[in-house]
Amino acid sequence: MITTIYHSPLGDISLAATARGLAGLWFRGFDCAPSMCADSARFDMNGGGLIDPDPAATAEEIEGCDALSGAHPMCASSPAHGSAIAVLERSWAWLNAYFAGQAPRWVPPMDFGGDNFEHAVCVALLGVPYGEVVTVDDVAASVASRIGGAPDVCAVRDAASRCPVRVIVPVHRVEGLLTPDDPRECVGVALRALEATC
């Protein structure tokens, strides 16, 4: 696992990737960092190489991704981590386009784990158009069309709120998913406002 910090206009975002895809994306200070990052490696974007791990760190990070300065991630010097770095570069490009007010028509590869139901919820969320807001009931109906049956709305709400890849999987477009006092809802409101102005 490789991680990085992306400096967005709304605050720092941590990203975690495997060779298979993006495994986590969360706003630092608002979302919890996944425990899966404990065995991650650090990559120096400026120097272009892996750095020896700091034994005090629980998750090591790539430095240098910055939406505001236009810095560009460098390629991995280690073939073992090259695929994960490529996933982070695609994620970085997606975030740059998004925060520039564009609606990216592609998503980076995903590797967010979970069961089939959680995957169905994430796929349903990916279908919510840029700038639109839906209800949990709408997401549940979309999930039902994919897996059959009528999923419990509470189960859909729980799966959506646990989605490890926020922003790219637009959890913020689901009205009423989080309570107003949940700090993540502040980020969701800001993301919806960004989409409304573009």
Question: What positions do the PLM features span?
Answer:
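Nucleic acid-binding interface residues in structured DNA/RNA-binding domains
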Residues: 6, 102-198
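Low-complexity, small/basic-enriched stretches
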Residues: 1-106, 175-198
